[in-house]
């Protein structure tokens, strides 16, 4: 019995070591707002969870992402509230829960994405040279404050979905023109400006958080030629970064074959970078976008969402270069007036407060443990575990309903 316990501990230690290079979690930038509104998060049994981040960690999630706006105070969208003080507090909680922290600089007062990369109002009068210095100083100051607050980031995005550049100008200035945009056919001056901004932001990251990994976030997943043009330019300009970050939403980016093509293309280019899916999500109720519709394969139901998640993870786990998976806005929960009710790809049932099945699939990305790994040996010598598991390590929420082979109490069980 002592020998079995020793072997178990050795296996568990090895398992943890192997898993440490992969990260799974979500962008939980609105969690404090739900908590302030009195939203109750529950576990699979319906019991209220007193510490949501501890619960996430216990369920196998090991990293969380938080967005940061420069000055969100004038935005009408209630979801745009993440100023530096907000992010420091949430970041500290994430770190105290033992998880990795990904900091997502938007370098804007509002949402930054391929359609809009508006310059913060306070920076609108700066020349390009002044803007290079500002992004360096701002990034450096934010990171200094994050460190002082006990919220040192482990991964840093220098821009959000910057496929076509960043800091185009204010919305009033840049909405109806292509100034400062970085398309494949854009003037080299636009790209040079963009690259200088990235280099200055990256310089601040290396100085203040030398252990953190820098992520360049591109969402041109369905257009590999456009995506690789972006990263070819980064390589040619010797931009300093560690991770290629991608967005992948089936409703906007196509089916899993499109994602696999993108991953294969990136790997064949041999950029020497890890790849992370820093944003993903799939609906449990109705379409979140109109570009593509895969409801015939993955119905807009809890089970359809779970199946998509399982298939996504199976695909990602075939690619050794992919070491991160983050669900966007998984914490959306309850029926409080926290923000506009348009997102229906969360991982919580708004009526029951319990996680959807897809929530429990996420940990398969890093390789969930099995009942064999969680055995313990009480004095009377009876071997026990913490539940029923599939042979590939997925914990069930009760006794299995389908026939098959399972693990229970450290032994194979045929149902």
Placement of each model-derived feature along the sequence:
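Glycoside hydrolase catalytic-domain groove-lining segments
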Residues: 49-53, 192, 203, 207-214, ...
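Substrate-binding cleft and catalytic face of glycoside hydrolase catalytic domains
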Residues: 54-213, 219
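Hydrophobic h-region of N-terminal signal peptides that target proteins for export
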Residues: 7-19
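Residue-level detector of functionally pivotal "anchor" positions at catalytic/ligand-binding pockets or at interdomain
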Residues: 368-392
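C-terminal tail/sorting-segment detector
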Residues: 405-415
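Hydrophobic faces of well-ordered beta-strands that scaffold small-molecule active sites
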Residues: 24-28, 64-66, 101-105, 154-158, ...
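Boundary/entry segment of secreted carbohydrate-active catalytic domains
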Residues: 21-52
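Aromatic-rich peripheral "rim/lid" segments of glycoside hydrolase catalytic domains that contact
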Residues: 41-42, 173-176, 261, 265, ...
């Amino acid at each position: 019995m002592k020998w079995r316990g020793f072997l178990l501990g050795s296996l568990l230690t090895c398992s943890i070591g192997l898993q440490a290079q992969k990260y799974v979690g979500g962008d939980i930038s609105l969690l404090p707002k739900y908590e302030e509104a009195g939203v109750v998060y529950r576990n699979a049994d319906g019991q209220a969870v007193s510490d949501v981040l501890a619960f996430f960690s216990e369920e196998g999630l090991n990293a969380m992402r938080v967005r940061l706006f420069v000055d969100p105070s004038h935005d009408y969208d209630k979801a745009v509230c993440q100023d530096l003080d907000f992010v420091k507090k949430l970041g500290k909680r994430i770190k105290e829960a033992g998880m990795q922290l990904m900091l997502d600089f938007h370098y804007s007062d509002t949402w930054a994405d391929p359609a809009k990369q508006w310059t913060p109002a306070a920076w609108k009068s700066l020349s390009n040279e002044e803007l290079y210095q500002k992004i360096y100083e701002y990034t450096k100051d934010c990171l200094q404050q994050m460190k002082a607050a006990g919220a040192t980031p482990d991964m840093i995005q220098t821009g959000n979905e910057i496929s076509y550049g960043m800091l185009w100008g204010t919305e009033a200035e840049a909405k109806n023109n292509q100034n400062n945009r970085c398309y494949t056919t854009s003037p080299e001056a636009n790209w040079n400006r963009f690259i200088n901004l990235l280099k200055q932001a990256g310089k601040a990251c290396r100085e203040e958080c030398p252990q953190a990994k820098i992520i360049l976030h591109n969402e041109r997943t369905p257009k590999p030629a456009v995506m690789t043009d972006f990263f070819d330019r980064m390589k040619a300009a010797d931009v300093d970064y560690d991770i290629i970050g991608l967005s992948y939403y089936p409703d906007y980016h196509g089916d899993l074959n499109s994602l696999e093509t993108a991953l294969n293309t990136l790997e064949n280019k041999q950029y020497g970078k890890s790849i992370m899916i820093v944003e993903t999500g799939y609906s449990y109720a109705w379409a979140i976008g109109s570009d593509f519709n895969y409801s015939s394969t993955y119905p807009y139901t809890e089970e359809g969402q779970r199946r998509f998640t399982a298939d996504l993870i199976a695909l990602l786990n075939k690619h050794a270069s992919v070491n991160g998976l983050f669900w966007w806005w998984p914490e959306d929960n309850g029926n409080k007036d926290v923000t506009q009710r348009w997102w229906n790809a969360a991982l919580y049932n708004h009526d029951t407060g319990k996680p959807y099945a897809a929530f429990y699939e996420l940990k398969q990305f890093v390789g969930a443990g099995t009942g064999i790994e969680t055995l313990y040996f009480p004095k009377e010598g009876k071997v026990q575990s913490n539940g029923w598991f599939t042979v590939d390590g997925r914990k069930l929420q009760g006794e299995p309903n389908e026939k098959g082979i399972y693990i229970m109490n450290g032994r194979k069980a045929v149902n």
